[in-house]
Amino acid sequence: MTIGLCACGSDSDNLPVDAPVADTYGEPSQSSAVPSSADTNISSADASSPETEAVADAEPLRDATPVCLVPRADGTATASNDVAVIDYSHMSDGYVCANYTGTCPKVKLRITGPDTVVYTYNLHGGGYETFPLSSGDGYYDVTIYENISGTNYATCLYADLDVQITDAFSPFLYPNQYVNFTADSKVVAKGQELAEGASSDLEVITRIYDYITQNITYDYGKASDPPTGYTSDVDAILASGTGICLDYAAVMASMLRSQRIPTRLEVGYAQDAYHAWISVYTADTGWLNGIIEFDGNVWTLVDPTFGANTDDKTLKKFIGDGSNYILQKMY
C-alpha cells in the first residue's frame, strides 16, 4: 500500500542566516464548574432502592461549556519600528503576536526556540497574528523578514526573548495560525455538542475523533496540488466535509482545545509523505502520542486522516510502534 496523503509544494525563498524556506503550511487563514442538577427529595424509604443506588454510582458528567482563550497584544512588551511590531506581552502564556503595516507584499516571520527547530510563517498584515512558542522554556529568536527581490529576504525586525512559560499546556490551548478558532466558530459549537453528556476527557476525545473520521472525507485533488503556504479554515472544512491531513488535524485540535483539552497539531513525515496529525493530553494518561484507538488501557497517535481513510488492520500495521511517523514541528 502506498500512502501519499499530502503532496505539498514548498517555497524556495532564501532567508538570511541559513533560514529554511517557509513551512508548507505556513500561510495564515484569514480571519470549571460542574453543571448544576435539579434538587431531588428522596425519602428514607427510597434511599436504598436500586434506582437510588444507580444514581449514586453514576459517574458525574464533565462540563462541556467551551473555553476559548483569546490571544492579546497589549503592547506592554514589544519590539517595533515604523512598519512592524512583535508583541511578546504574553510570552509567558506560550505565544507571541506580530503585525506588519508596511507595503512589502511578501513578509515572513521566523521563530527559533531553545531546541533550535526553526518555524517559518507567512505574515500578512492587517492586524495581529498569533504564533505559538512550541519549544518550552528558553531563549527564542523572533524575526520578521521582508522580500527584497526574487527569493531574497532582508531582516525587518527582530526580538530576542528569554521565555518562561507559566503553564506548559498554554501553547496547545490558545488558537494560532494553524489551529485558528474563536468562541463564534462553528467547530467550537460542534465540539460542545459532541462533548455534551460525556463523563471524561477520554470520552470527549473518542466522540470527536469518531465524528471527524466519519464525517470528513479525504480530498485527493486538493492534496495533489495544495496552495503554497496552506493553512486550514476550520469552519469551511466542517461545512464542506472534505479536507486534507492538515484540515483533519486542525478541526479536531480546535474542537479539543475549546473543550480545555491540550492538543498539539504535529507536522512531519508518515513514511515518505508530508503529513499532519495530533497528540492530546489528559490528566489520567498524560500526553497521548500516536493515537488510533483505545483498547481499555492505552492510547497512541491521534491521526484522524488515516483513521478516516484506512481499514483497521492496515492502519494498525502502518502505525506499528510509531516509527513510521517522524515529528518535525508542533503547533
Feature roles, as predicted:
Residues D247-Y331:
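Hydrophobic/aromatic-rich core segments of domains that either
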Residues S200-T206, Q214, D233, R257-R264, ...:
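Loop/turn elements at helix/coil->beta-strand transitions in domains of secreted/extracellular proteins
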Residues T2-S200, W287-G290, N324-Y331:
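N-terminal accessory/pre-domain segments preceding catalytic cores
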Residues V204-G221, G307:
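Glycine-rich, acidic and aromatic/proline-enriched surface loops and short helix-turn segments
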Residues Q214-G243:
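Short, conserved helix/loop micro-motifs enriched in His/Cys and acidic residues
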Residues S199-I205, D219-T228, T263-Y269:
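Surface-exposed patches in mature extracellular/periplasmic domains of secreted proteins
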Residues V204-I208, G241-L256:
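Active-site nucleophilic cysteine motif
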Residues V118-Y119, S240-G243, E266-Y269:
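Alpha-helix capping and helix-loop boundary segments enriched in small/acidic/polar residues
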